[in-house]
Amino acid sequence: MKLVDRFRGAATGTSRRLMVGAVGAALLSGLVGFVGGSATASAFSRPGLPVEYLQVPSVAMGRNIKVQFQSGGANSPALYLLDGMRAQDDFSGWDINTPAFEWYYQSGISVAMPVGGQSSFYSDWYNPACGKAGCTTYKWETFLTSELPQYLSANKGVKPTGSGVVGLSMAGSSALILAAYHPDQFVYSGSLSALLDPSQGIGPSLIGLAMGDAGGYKASDMWGPKDDPAWARNDPMLQVGKLVANNTRIWVYCGNGKPSDLGGDNLPAKFLEGFVRTSNMKFQAAYNAAGGHNAVWNFDDNGTHSWEYWGAQLNAMRPDLQHTLGATPNTGDTQGA
């Protein structure tokens, strides 16, 4: 029996607590290295690309939010790229670890990478987000669905509706939830290697452990105790009907924990990907049972919890995004070349 399979069975009492601790240790060690690592200069976008560093005012969060931005042209649709559990405050993990701006240059899609949001699940928290660095306000859903699209529309000529949102790991479930509740804004949602049933089973306990390690945050400050309605409200498995009713175009990816020549050949990355895969398969079944018919499912026979695979998926989905968002490539623009 595979290691990950041993943790998926039912457990109660002492065995359940031991299971949470064991899985939590693996999750934490995986998150430390693979959901937002250290920035290296060579990983950033090449010089010459028209990447801007915006300071977007947020009344909801009481501060300016840094957003890395690349225009897709006048009246272009937007792609919001959301970071992982260990999102940094200086640059987006998407820019640190992938050439995302390069891939989407002249695609006709404006790319927005909000910076920050460690352990936030890009949600509106009940309470202040208090961690090792102090307390701040997390109202990310309000920012992403109201303040940021209004700013980009007014200042950068970006369409406020008909956008796409893609997230990895922590933010994969966030991307689906944002699309479920804001269908006019997000007609496309991509989830990469996410836990898609966070409110169920040991999910709240594991999320609490991970958030505590990634910044010292408390899950109860985010969504309250595990039986609070906010947990169900932010659970893609329980909100799959909304995605089907909205006819949202979704792209769901998860590997199986086996590395390929892309990399990620280490125990934490392998374990974590294998662990979340089951929830992705269940989500597919729930989507199909609800009558969904507008999805791409990539459950590869390889892939670990690491940026190499998430980047490959983002690059692969570009034509699908362009088609769904109605983007017009601007290959005649030589800016940034």
Swiss-Prot record:
Belongs to the mycobacterial A85 antigen family. Keywords: Acyltransferase, Cell wall, Cytoplasm, Disulfide bond, Secreted, Signal, Transferase. GO terms for cellular component: cytoplasm; extracellular region. It is found in: Secreted, Cell wall; Cytoplasm. Pfam families: Esterase. Substrate binds at residues 85-86, 169, 197, 275-278, 282, 305-307. Homodimer. The keyword Ribosomal protein does not apply. The keyword tRNA processing does not apply. The antigen 85 proteins (FbpA, FbpB, FbpC) are responsible for the high affinity of mycobacteria for fibronectin, a large adhesive glycoprotein, which facilitates the attachment of M.tuberculosis to murine alveolar macrophages (AMs). They also help to maintain the integrity of the cell wall by catalyzing the transfer of mycolic acids to cell wall arabinogalactan, and through the synthesis of alpha,alpha-trehalose dimycolate (TDM, cord factor). Its EC number is 2.3.1.122, 2.3.1.20. Disulfide bonds join 130-135. This is Diacylglycerol acyltransferase/mycolyltransferase Ag85A. Residues 101-111 are annotated as: Fibronectin-binding. It catalyses: an acyl-CoA + a 1,2-diacyl-sn-glycerol = a triacyl-sn-glycerol + CoA; 2 alpha,alpha'-trehalose 6-mycolate = alpha,alpha'-trehalose 6,6'-bismycolate + alpha,alpha-trehalose. The active site is at 169 (nucleophile), 273, 305. One of its GO terms (molecular function) is trehalose O-mycolyltransferase activity. Its main location: secreted. Residues 1-42 form the signal peptide.
